Amino acid sequence: MATDVVFDTSMGSFTVELYNEHAPKTCRNFATLAQRGYYNNVIFHRIIPNFMVQTGDPTGTGRGGSSIYGEKFEDEIHPGLKHTGAGVLSMANSGPNTNGSQFFITLAPTPWLDGKHTIFGRVKSGMRVIQRMGLVKTNSEDRPVDEVKIIRAKVVEEGDE
């Protein structure tokens, strides 16, 4: 059974498909946070063209956020999953085993992140929205000048019709 999360943002909607079998703990954390409304009204605090868009921190600083397991939880690095191109859904962290609520979506191949960040899904639809986000004007700290934010995140279980 596949789990999708639909994000309505200030720039349009996109859907991610979660890799429950490769990163079960990470996917459970992400889906539960989305279900609880944790990501609603959260900004994309870091956008780097041709690299990635990052969000998931309710403080909007890039230093906040926590998981459903408490503070931080361990990586689930799967050798078969690589940051091979645009649309990879991966956990942001501050070193090994420091996953919380922040995540990013790649805009290009980022092989230097392989083995360092937990890949737990991919963009299933709405990649154009992500690509447009990657083009917004940012300041010297990679923060969008005009706010880009998640309006609402909604979990959709396939086969729930």
Curated annotation (Swiss-Prot):
It comes from the Eukaryota. InterPro entries: Cyclophilin-like_dom_sf, Cyclophilin-type_PPIase, Cyclophilin-type_PPIase_CS, Cyclophilin-type_PPIase_dom, Cyclophilin_A-like. One of its GO terms (biological process) is mRNA splicing, via spliceosome. Residues 1-155 form the PPIase cyclophilin-type domain. It is an enzyme of class 5 (isomerase). One of its GO terms (cellular component) is catalytic step 2 spliceosome. The keyword Isomerase applies. Pfam families: Pro_isomerase. Keywords: Isomerase, Rotamase. Belongs to the cyclophilin-type PPIase family. PPIL1 subfamily. PPIases accelerate the folding of proteins. It catalyzes the cis-trans isomerization of proline imidic peptide bonds in oligopeptides. PANTHER family: PEPTIDYL-PROLYL CIS-TRANS ISOMERASE-RELATED, PEPTIDYLPROLYL ISOMERASE DOMAIN AND WD REPEAT-CONTAINING PROTEIN 1. This is Peptidyl-prolyl cis-trans isomerase-like 1. It comes from Aspergillus fumigatus (strain ATCC MYA-4609 / CBS 101355 / FGSC A1100 / Af293). The gene is cyp1.
